[in-house]
Amino acid sequence: MTTKIERRIKIKYRVRNKVSGTAARPRMSVFRSNKQIYVQIIDDLSGKTLAAASSLGMTEKLPKKEVAAKVGEIIAKKAQEAGITTVVFDRNGYLYHGRVKEVADAARNGGLKF
């Protein structure tokens, strides 16, 4: 019997074999912990992070979904400053639901195309 974490890691590796980011269309990777949410835009060919945002520095207390939406807005703004308009969305083995969905929707509303 596999745990939730083992299941997520299996899905993550299965998806990562298919999804790769380039300089023209980098990969937007989401990591979700119990308290925080982190988003990176990565060029896999050069192995560099082009933009990153997280909920670590946020001081105001908000529900987790609202925090995720703010992080999505921040990453969209940073991506546009770096000249990135289209990305490949990597949900990192998480279900496209809840905080992961909020990040994606906020990034789309901020101007990123998936």
Curated annotation (Swiss-Prot):
Keywords: Ribonucleoprotein, Ribosomal protein, RNA-binding, rRNA-binding. It holds the Pfam family Ribosomal_L18p. GO terms for cellular component: cytosolic large ribosomal subunit. Signal peptide: none annotated. GO terms for biological process: translation. GO terms for molecular function: 5S rRNA binding; structural constituent of ribosome. Part of the 50S ribosomal subunit; part of the 5S rRNA/L5/L18/L25 subcomplex. Contacts the 5S and 23S rRNAs. NCBIfam families: L18_bact. Belongs to the universal ribosomal protein uL18 family. This is one of the proteins that bind and probably mediate the attachment of the 5S RNA into the large ribosomal subunit, where it forms part of the central protuberance. This is Large ribosomal subunit protein uL18.
